[in-house]
Amino acid sequence: MLRGRSLSVTSLGGLPVWEAERLPVEDLLLFEVSWEVTNKVGGICTVIQTKAKTTADEWGENYFLIGPYFEHNMKTQVEQCEPTNDAVRKAVDAMNKHGCQVHFGRWLIEGSPYVVLFDISSSAWNLDRWKGDFWEACGVGIPHHDREANDMLIFGSLTAWFLKEVTDHADGKHVIAQFHEWQAGTGLILSRARKLPIATVFTTHATLLGRYLCAANIDFYNQLDKFDIDKEAGERQIYHRYCMERASVHCAHVFTTVSEITAIEAEHMLKRKPDVVTPNGLNVKKFSAVHEFQNLHAMYKARIQDFVRGHFYGHLDFDLEKTLFLFIAGRYEFSNKGADIFLESLSRLNFLLRMHKSNVTVVVFFIMPAKTNNFNVETLKGQAVRKQLWDTVHCLKEKFGKKLYDGLLRGEIPDMNSILDRDDLTIMKRAIFSTQRQSLPPVTTHNMIDDSTDPILSTIRRIGLFNNRADRVKVILHPEFLSSTSPLLPMDYEEFVRGCHLGVFPSYYEPWGYTPAECTVMGIPSVTTNLSGFGCFVQEHVADPTAYGIYIVDRRFRSPDDSCNQLTQFLYGFCKQSRRQRIIQRNRTERLSDLLDWRYLGRYYQHARHLTLSRAFPDKFHLEPTSPPTTDGFKYPRPSSVPPSPSGSQASSPQCSDAEDEEDEDERYDEEEEAERDRLNIKSPFSLNHFPKGKKKLHGEYKN
């Protein structure tokens, strides 16, 4: 979104319309450059993958992605083909003739965009020469021992070389190149230093130094204007990377960030105010299960319940129908991802549930990849015991059913004692004995390499959440990404999320936050913070986020202890909801997915391209300055109906409502009517100038 200007999601009612002149894409070439093209490392791959269809629909054959070549990724994700564009074909051929290995094909994702992949290893012999070129271009030296930075220099040099070959054969077509993150920034710096006729955009999804500082328990956001940036980068031995990032920012015609909170950070860390904020979206169609997401929730919840039965065998004294599944997922950044405050809140939640003698049990999953040796033997044994018991029950059921069937055919009601013989009783007793357990259920599914120093396990030991019988909160650390081929929890991430009740992401540093956004489009409530880009985005668009299943923890203006208490209250309030209240909340959450669709948020990228063309080629392209529409904007309103039983949604609800809610059935609730009201109300994006100044924290408050 343009700074100080309200762009809109025009297909939603109640929004001011931004009339943008369509770009002549048939006379343009668009390249997006990222280290995560066909190479998933973090969230940038999700951004590019989900946005690909929208961009490909707009640009057609003139849209290309540039990334690194890895043999495994090429075999499984890319279909090789010949370039149809003459300029691109000549550029690929020219580089291959000079000894580079350039691969071209279609990425096998929705939209099937073209990809150009460079083999870094085949060009490594040029490293010393390219280091000299880079030093002459911007005065930044790259240490020999930093292999990642050296790889980025090779990648950037190949990118700049390729773009030069393209512009030499473009036949009058103008070229736009968008570079994502500092890893791709070297190509931008070299392209500008060589004065290539290219309109450039640089997008930062997070600042290098910001991530480091936040991980050090520093009151980051309230001291942004006080940091000695060069000193901080030097102390962390990332000064050369910081210089590469900052040079990329200042060389670009247009600088964009993914959220307002990151825009503030970038202005202080990188010394340039972003021109456009480009919020991250999702391909909502990918996640939509038309009117069936409630049924999918029930189906995948049953699979999680199966895992829990095995994991807690011998201690399964809680009702699985009154058990809530919570989870946190992401990179293993203990403080940045909010795992520290989450664990402390779970300890307090456990105390509240026990004190109030609640019959609700909470099982919490930590899906955060870490270094492991192998699977935990106790965890594997639990799943084996569960499967064996299931097979035993099926065998007895068939035998019991046959005897019952024969008796009824004879016109007799069989004696129950005669149906089960001595062997059957012996089998059942052996099954019961097999479920006996002397030890507590493990808190981790794998054997950790650094068990004694692992932050999550160390905190679990401190707060005492060991999965005791008396605990109402149970904890399971799954230090590996989910996979449908896992012998423990054979589910993909999307299936797992749909089966859970609440995603909890109380991050301290989260430039955007895809995990709560993915929960939203799948109709799963989530917890986020006002320090995440997604949390700020929702606060500005939704009048009562909590009613729509998005709980926003204040981590900017409250002390860590107060934030922890607020999160505890959110979790405790969620535990007190009835089943039908949760069904209503999931319906409302799913409706917010309209806000996150790339079909709407993609227009901010469109504007960035307009802007960079007008700056790079002012004689050919002109962007008329437009003042903000005369409107105060709209918000998704507070829901007008409060009853906990949605009569209109019961057809798609897989479960019956709790008996204690029957007295509310006479209150009218029309799901479709409320949904239509909600879709007609939305607030336009806010201006950076209205962001409030934070409250100072006392020294040491962040060291929980």
Curated annotation (Swiss-Prot):
- Tell me which UniProt keywords the record has, alphabetically: Allosteric enzyme, Glycogen biosynthesis, Glycosyltransferase, Phosphoprotein, Transferase
- Residue ranges annotated as compositionally biased, kind Acidic residues, are 658-675
Q: Where is this region: Disordered?
A: 620-704
The entry's note on the tissues where this protein occurs is: Specifically expressed in liver.
Factors inducing expression: Expression in the liver oscillates in a circadian manner with peak levels during the night.
Query: Which family is it part of?
Result: Belongs to the glycosyltransferase 3 family.
Q: How does it assemble?
A: Part of the glycogen synthase (GS)-glycogenin complex, a heterooctamer composed of a tetramer of GS and 2 dimers of glycogenin, where each GS protomer binds to one glycogenin subunit (via glycogenin C-terminus); the GS tetramer may dissociate from glycogenin dimers to continue glycogen polymerization on its own. May also form a heterooctamer complex with GYG1 (via GYG1 C-terminus).
Protein name per its UniProtKB record? Glycogen [starch] synthase, liver
